[in-house]
Every structure is written in C-alpha cells, then in structure tokens.
Amino acid sequence: MSTKGRKLTVATFVLLFLLTACNQPVDTGSSNTQIMLAAYTVPKEAYQKEIIPAFQKQWKEKTGQTVTFKESYVGSGAQARAIVNGLEADVAALSLEGDIETIHKAGLITHDWKQRPHNGMITRSVVAFGVKKGNPLTIREWQDLTKPGIAVLYPSPRTSGGAMWDINAIYGAGLKMAEMETGKKDPDRGRELLSAIQKNVKVMDNSGRESMTTFEKGLGDVVVTYENELLLRNMEQPLYDVIYPKATILIENPVALVDKNVDKHGNRAVVEAFVAYLQSTEAQRAFAKYGFRPVDPTVMAETKDKFPEPEWLFDIDYLGGWATASEQIYGPQGVWTGIVEGKKGS
C-alpha cells in the first residue's frame, strides 16, 4: 500500500472512531453530563434557585460528574406541543396530566409514568384570587367576579395548563355550589358561572406567569391563578391579598422522563435520578418555599400553616377525571368552547 493510501486509511479510521465516540451514551463514564428540562413557567424560580443547584451538588458528590441543565419554560400546553414537534426534552415537568399524555400518545414517553409515587405528581396547589393589598373591592367569592366593572385576568387554555385549572375551578365551583344548595350537581350552574366571569375577562395571556405580569402592570382588579404564584410574589414583602373562595380545585402537577429523547442522549441514569429527586424531602421543601403544596406527607405536615384548606375543595375527579373534563369543557361541543365561540356548550 502507498504512503498516501495508508494516510487515507488512518484518517478514515480516526474519523469513524470520532463519529462513533460522539454517538456513544454520555453517562456515568464521563466527567460531564446534561439534562434538558422542559417545564411550564410557574415553577421556574424553584428550579433555578433551589432544586437544580442542589441536585447538581448531590450528583457531583455521588458520581464525580458535573451535570449541566438546558432549560425551557413556556405554558404547559405549548411546552407539550414543542416536545412532540421535536424539542428534545429529557424531562417534562408540566402543569397537568393531559399534557404529559399528549407526549405519551406521541410515542415519546414509553413507560407508565403514573407508576411513580404520588401517581407521578411532584407539586400541588389550589386556584385562588389575587387582589390589590387591602382588597379594596371586597372580593371574596366567585360571584364577585361576575359583577359589572370587575376586570378579571386569567390565561388562555389553548396555551396554558394553568388556565385549564382556572376554568375547571370556576365550572366545578358552580357544580359544587349547586350541590351544597340542592344536593346535586347542576351543569347549568357551572356554565352560567363560567359564562358570567368570562364576560369580565379583559386579557387572556399565554401562561399563568404572563397573567401575573399583566396584573403587576396594573391591569385588572383580580387575577385568577395558582396560589403559589401569589405566595411567590409575597415572599419578600406582601404585595397582594390572597383570597380563597369556598369552592375551588386542588391542582396536581406531573413530571415524566421522556424515554425516546433520553435513549437518544444516553443519559438515563442521571435523568432518572433527577426525576426521583423531585419527590425527595429536600426538593419538596424547596417547592414549598416557593409556594407549592408538597406531595410528600412529611413536608406537608411541616408546612400546613402556610396552606389553608378551602371549605369545599374538590379535585379533578369531581369533574369526572381529565379525559371527561377535557371533552366536556374544552372539546368541540364543550362548555368553555361554546362560551367563547358565542354558542351554547353541551
């Protein structure tokens, strides 16, 4: 073989070696690894200021690896669609079960994510009202949001999981109030309450975080949002009164490892450890610090004075579960769809 031929053979071998090496899983055999976290907007501070740094420290001490994070924070529904459309997230930490199921149905999550403790949930909250300090308009209950001249804010359910929780809370409150008065749920009461409040909604932003930003700019008399969004704003100084209506919904927020992306990236060990860490006592205390209700019973007991229990609290099962609620409220003939399109929903 000529010298030139030998040089080409060596060069080809080196190139093939490098390409092969670059496609090998980067896990505990390397000094560095990476996690791509795709989350809804609301827990951004908890992740960036507490949870990610604590996990990085723990993982470094355990394995010697430095783990870096790429992060994306947008509305939950938009985030789910981004993952389905090619965002290579290793972890989906979203607002609601249905958004995780969107990724699952696309074939990207292949395991039973609800088999984790707490059915795969990592935080809880409730839907509450935020009003200006001192509550100048004396807003106490959902009916107060139907009064003429009251400017209401909540985001759009087309992009925001938080908005779906808000709308579920309103519709469910109508059912609950009817049940407490008559002994039976009345869908008409739910529709009437939702329709009356929707007439007073001035802006529907893309996410719960954007709705809070709009409220902070001085637009609106009341923002319907996650309790934790309001507690976060009040951490350093009390900016808003947090109002808990008697009837409201318990919010539960899921997380799941995205199998197809993890297998492509070869980082399953560190991603599984991070997902497990989110339910640890340490992470649950961090979530509680930023206003989220813990799923861990021990941490919830430690923080119970921070989180009032609304009198007529209900969960998604009260509305028949997510599949039923999605169809009856947001489907083509759904209640909310009918209201915003100017026709009577089913």
Predicted region positions:
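Extracytoplasmic
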Residues: S30-N32, G64-T66, V74, A78, ...
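Early extracytoplasmic/lumenal segment of secretory-pathway proteins
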Residues: C22-A106, W113-R116, Y226
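Ligand-binding pocket segment of bilobal, Venus flytrap-like solute-binding proteins
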Residues: M177-P245
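Structural recognition of the beta-strand scaffold that forms the well-ordered cores
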Residues: M36-A39, K70-S72, V91-L94, M121, ...
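Short, low-complexity disordered leader/linker segments with a strong preference
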Residues: M1-T33, S346
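A conserved helix-loop-strand patch within extracytoplasmic ligand-binding domains
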Residues: H104-K176
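Extracellular/periplasmic juxtamembrane helices and adjacent flexible linkers that interface
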Residues: V262-S346
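Periplasmic-binding protein-like
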Residues: M121-V126, G190-Q198, D205, E236-R268, ...
